[in-house]
Amino acid sequence: MKKIKRSAADPDPVYPFGDEVPIPLPPFLVPGGGLTTDGLSLAVQTVDPLNVTLGGVGLKIGDGLSVVDGKLTSEAKIVADPPLQQSGDTLSLSTDSSMMVLPSGQLTINNLPSISVTSSGVGLVSPNAPLQLMSNGALQLSVGGGLTVGAQGSLQISTGVGVNVNAAGVLESYPLPPLVWDYSSKSLTLDIGPGLTVVNGKLQVIGATFSNQMSRMAPAPRADLQSNSIEPLPSPPSKTSLDIAEELQNDKGVSFAFQAREEELGAFTKRTLFAYSGDGLTGPFKAPASAELSSFLTAHPKGRWLIAFPLGTGIVSVDEGILTLEISRSLPEVGSGSSSTSLKVISIYFMDLFFPVPFIDRASHPAPRRSNNSRQLFHSKQRLFLKVKDFKKRSWYSSLFTLINLNIQECPELS
């Protein structure tokens, strides 16, 4: 019997696993539209983050995501640091009134009177005086006379002679003689000497009356010395030829103010030196002086000046431009009447006298030998000295020196 050969295209009904037999799909299933076939199996085709798990389509999720009640939920939260702020699902920028957001979404600065906004940046508008804008962009205060900028950048007052700023930062005035500051009444007063008084707030000469038409002075009683008398001397007109003031400071920071004045009084020249201590002084004071003040001090015949100030009495001298003030004990004025004094030298330190003729009858008062009980009166072209035993008994001396307007001080005997 002839064996019939089976066609290779026909499936083997006994063992059909060797060949792939296409399985016809229903017309409503189209492979490639999310479905795939594997032999007799029909499967769903997925890509990440989808997958097939336990016969179902699942979603792969990472940190920050979870499924709650069948809904995908995000566990991540946005934390905004200032100036950012979060309002619901919106993140925004917090600004004040000096800044604004343009409709285009750009951040800009509101125009202020003192600020200029240009394409090159933000700058200052040119300020009004006394402020000025420097070339480096810094704002500087322009100061004038009497003001300065200290080392710490603070505005300070420049002080001169008679004016100082105390530790509390208060501006104080230290007047020069004859003006005196009364601390009890906190007022400025005038220090007046013999022959002057204040009446109804006005300075007046004792014994003088004035009117609009003329002025007259009541004559003072004559002062007699035995058989000699002193006639009143005329008061020559004065002319100030020099008046300087300087504030000196030593290496310890102690300040002293000196005022030098030179007046032409007829036949003689009056040179006066005033000193004021802005700080306490317990020892010698040394500080450089200007050439003008040094020249004035060296004009003294002895090169030493006796001065009286609130702290006591001192001797002023100058050597190679260095002014030295030596403090001595406080001494009363001559003629104060406090007590009888021992032998002293009364020296007119502030005067250069030029008397054309002797004004004392020396024949009636010859100069004896020097002794503790002697009285000696002599004068020279530059200095006038007077040595007395008891000043109170010779009141005519005081009248004489008051008459010629001399400043007399009592000091220890000088060699």
From Swiss-Prot:
Protein name from the UniProt record: Fiber protein
Quaternary organization: Homotrimer. Interacts (via N-terminal tail region) with pentons.
Main location: virion
Function comment: Forms spikes that protrude from each vertex of the icosahedral capsid. Interacts with host receptor to provide virion initial attachment to target cell. Fiber proteins are shed during virus entry, when virus is still at the cell surface.
InterPro entries per UniProt: Adeno_fibre, Attachment_protein_shaft_sf, Fibre_HD
Coiled-coil stretches: none
Additional comment: All late proteins expressed from the major late promoter are produced by alternative splicing and alternative polyadenylation of the same gene giving rise to non-overlapping ORFs. A leader sequence is present in the N-terminus of all these mRNAs and is recognized by the viral shutoff protein to provide expression although conventional translation via ribosome scanning from the cap has been shut off in the host cell.
Signal peptide range in chain numbering: none
Domain statement: The tail region anchors the fiber to penton base capsomers, whereas the shaft, built from several repeated motifs, allows the knob to protrude from the virion.
Entry superkingdom: Viruses
A GO cellular component entry from the record: viral capsid
Family indicated by similarity: Belongs to the adenoviridae fiber family.
Keyword annotations from UniProtKB, A to Z: Capsid protein, Host nucleus, Host-virus interaction, Late protein, Viral attachment to host cell, Virion, Virus entry into host cell
Location in or out of the cell: Virion; Host nucleus
Induction: Expressed in the late phase of the viral replicative cycle.
Biological classification of the source: Viruses, Varidnaviria, Bamfordvirae, Preplasmiviricota, Tectiliviricetes
GO biological process assignments: cell adhesion; symbiont entry into host cell; virion attachment to host cell
